[in-house]
Amino acid sequence: MDFDTLVIGAGAAGMMCAAHTGGRVLIVDHAKAPGEKIRISGGGRCNFTNMHCDPAAFISENPHFAKSALARYTQWDFIDLVDRHAIPWHEKTLGQLFCDTSAKDIIAMLRGLMQSAGAELLLSTEVSALKQTAGGFSFELNGTRRLTARRVVIATGGKSIPKMGATGYAYDVAPQFGHRVTPTEPALVPFTFPDRRFADISGVACPARITANGTSFDEAMLFTHRGLSGPAILQVSSYWAAGDPITVHLAPDTELGTVL
């Protein structure tokens, strides 16, 4: 075997895996640089974790997965890792943690961890073929180089932000090896309307309580030329399905009597 582990995708999950899995590791990505979504996250400062990270905050068909995953590696473990690498950070609203300077600090930290572990990183590289063999997997890089690995980790992420190179690679490859892929729906997205009913107040933000299917979020809401956005809308979009009503309360903490 050429490698013990092949990791496909050099995002946050892929780099953490390559840094900690041990043995001979090859990590590949079709992008020109690793961690591209990290680089743009949090407005360029990377909202790398949350003080209040809890299994109940995750949406999953299998709630126990979030419990077991977070029990094995908590937000405090990652905060400790960031502190050990002397990356300054600060807390914003609702326990959100951001780098003081740049998301590039997190990328550099993860690259350093991979290098220390001896993982080999190949960029601008596509896995053009992947097959299971008796002893592991054989794969082809950029249609020419053929190698083998005992294990394969698919860490290419979802289809979000296609302009940055995101594809449905994982959804196409995983079923080849017997995995069931759950159909996906857009999440953490704004609500848009066919008309431009809020165009005159586009750019106006206000606190609001947004409710869908019994789940509410009290955060900022933003009127846009196409509809509604902002933290509250993005959060509740994960709980909404087509045809469901949405309740927007613009004065959730105000007694009606005091206004009248």
Language-model regions, residue ranges each:
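Short hydrophobic core segments
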Residues: 6-8, 28, 127, 146-163, ...
